[in-house]
UniProtKB/Swiss-Prot annotation:
Homodimer and heterodimer with BCAP31. Binds CASP8 as a complex containing BCAP31, BCAP29, BCL2 and/or BCL2L1. Interacts with VAMP3, VAMP1 and membrane IgD immunoglobulins. May interact with ACTG1 and non-muscle myosin II. Residues 166-233 form a coiled coil. This is B-cell receptor-associated protein 29. Residues 28-43, 125-240 are cytoplasmic. Residues 1-6, 65-103 are lumenal. One of its GO terms (cellular component) is endoplasmic reticulum membrane. A motif (Di-lysine motif) lies at residues 237-240. GO terms for biological process: apoptotic process; endoplasmic reticulum to Golgi vesicle-mediated transport; intracellular protein transport; protein localization to endoplasmic reticulum exit site.
Length: 240
């Protein structure tokens, strides 16, 4: 195997190893996300994109070269012509065909696994972000549930307080209404007494007024009689 195909085979083995490591079930995507978030990857991001495209181009070139070699050595005309000139040519051609097919598989799978590896890294990163987002949403949902539970408990407590307060308020209102009814009855009684007293006072005033009028009339009569008596007494003295 030449140096270039040895490098491609090593690259293929490395790809298989990385894919197997990425597929290990006990390493969570968040751990890979932390590894991918190292600052060193940010520094080589531009070089990494260029290297990725360069490796794809090289693998495509090697794959096409391997396809050309396979087509070259798998031609029936070439095999028959070589076999006629030299007895060992058939075995030599078959060996080259085997190497060409091996190189074809190595380059083809290297190209395929390289694309798979890039896609796998992207999917792991997206999965880690989704899991992180899911964790945040779960935490928010738990907080919302706790807050809702707290609000429900507070609401129940307020309902109980309002219920108790309503009962106490009802008792207070009943007591106040009872007291107001008693005060009302007392005021009615006092008002009736005052009305009776006023009526009696008015009657007394009327009686006193009538008595005063009679006394005035009697007094006027007595004055007239007194005047008449004085006049008579004066006339009697003059006659004597």
């Amino acid at each position: 195997m030449t140096l270039q195909w040895t490098a491609v085979a090593t690259f293929l083995y490395a790809e298989i190893g990385l894919i197997l490591i990425f597929c290990l079930p006990f390493i969570p995507p968040q751990r890979w996300q932390k590894i991918f978030s190292f600052s060193v990857w940010g520094k080589i991001a531009s070089f990494w994109n260029k290297a990725f495209l360069t490796i794809i181009i090289l693998l495509i070139v090697l794959f096409l070269d391997a396809v050309r070699e396979v087509r070259k050595y798998s031609s029936t005309h070439t095999i028959e012509k070589s076999s006629a000139s030299r007895p060992a040519a058939y075995e030599h051609t078959q060996m080259k065909l085997f190497r060409s097919q091996r190189n074809l598989y190595i380059s083809g799978f290297s190209l395929f696994f390289w694309l798979v590896l890039r896609r796998l890294v992207t999917l792991i990163t997206q999965l880690a972000k989704e899991l992180s987002h899911k964790g945040v949403l779960k935490h928010q949902a738990e907080n919302i549930n706790q807050a809702a539970k707290k609000f429900m408990e507070e609401n129940e407590r307020l309902k109980r307080l309002l219920k108790n307060y309503g009962k106490e308020e009802e008792h207070i209102l009943e007591a106040e209404n009872k007291k107001l009814e008693e005060d009302k009855e007392k005021l009615k009684t006092e008002l009736k007494k005052a009305s009776d007293a006023l009526s009696k006072a008015q009657n007394d005033v009327m009686i006193m007024k009538m008595q005063s009028e009679r006394l005035s009339k009697e007094y006027d009569r007595l004055l007239r009689e007194h005047s008449e008596l004085q006049d008579r007494a004066g006339k009697d003295k003059k006659c004597l």
